[in-house]
Amino acid sequence: MNIELGLNKKVRRAYGIDEIALVPGNRTLDYDLTDPSWMIGNLKREVPIVASAMDSVVDVNTAAELTKLGALGVINMEGIQTRYENPDEILNQIASVGKNDFVPLMQKIYSEPVKGELILKRINEVKERGGIAAFSGTPQAAIKFQEILNNSKLDLFFLQGTVVSTEHIGMEGKESLNIKDLCKSMRVPVVAGNCVTYEVAKLLMRAGVA
């Protein structure tokens, strides 16, 4: 079902897993007649799967492989991939420790700052492997690294947050984020979610979110 947002912009109703119930009916449908494809901006994906932007889920190789399979993998721009030159060594450390040592190790690992040159390197690595470069970052990171992202081969930017609204107000002295301004200034489509109500989702899309 298409929904008109105004300014010639249309969106399609999406459903969560909990909203779907498969009930056998009196007719069946040949799978060749179905079309599960979807689009973000000018990017078309054949499989409606987006892999989570978590260090334990998506790295450069995973993102490239998911692209080849018709899906999409998102890399955490503020994770291990952009803090360390060799993220595999860090992942091996995490896998090797017990429960008692896990928290101190994670605190130590994530105390290392995110490096702009590594963001650029990971984007290039995904593209060199034929993948779609989709990266996720917080509002603060979106502001801090926007110039690097706009001058890279990035394809999609996912705005990361527990709750996302059209305007993020930061602490005094810190630059605040306005999603409408971000969407206008970013070279690539901006994706955002984690909103509960229909009204907020509509506001986000009207602000320019893909």
State where each predicted segment sits.
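Active-site entrance/lid segments in N-terminal catalytic domains of soluble metabolic enzymes
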Residues: 1-210
